[in-house]
Amino acid sequence: MKYFLMLLGIIPAGTLFSCGAKSNALKTNNMSNDTTINPSAITPDAHTAVATFANGCFWCTEAVFQQIEGVTKVTSGYSGGHVPNPTYEQVCEKNTGHAEALQIVYDPAVISFDELLEVFWKTHDPTTLNRQGNDVGPQYRSVVFYHNNTQKEKAEAYKAELDKSGAWSNPIVTAIEPFKNFYPAEDYHQNYYRLNGKAPYCQYVIRPKLEKFEKVFKDKLKKQ
């Protein structure tokens, strides 16, 4: 149980900052998502697989999964909604159905889907509906978007085990849904922590979370 609480201990650090504030700080007048990401960069090849998770602000979650050995590409974007190629502003209006999500390409010979699930559940609060800390809205909901029956079964089994374990005082509300779509977010959202590490949100929210993550998952980190 302490293993989970160690990571969740960083949540209060974000009380003065919310990822949602970026809608004002980075708002653009462009009403179309003209990201230049090459689709092949987020498409697995014969030696890789893909996982799609939503667990809060993708600025934070991207920085976590980029650290994992065996993860070859992490793309921030939008998934689970009904509006094609949405902009960030549209998603923030809460009527596209999309969640902020990550498309994670990984090498199953190095890191398993089970291990990615472990990181997913232990680096956010899966008991808060449509909310992570100060970030509130359906775009911050907790979801595993499964790509095949094996991923579905593993996610459901892990969720059931967590609920049974009593690791959380409240029920887990993470949804487990079939993958339907993923639209890469605008370029300024990609590699956000790496490119903006000195920004206040990175210093006071993302960095503390990464430090906690690095201590707990030190055996899964990429070699420097």
Segments (PLM) and residue ranges:
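Bacterial N-terminal signal peptides
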Residues: M6-T15
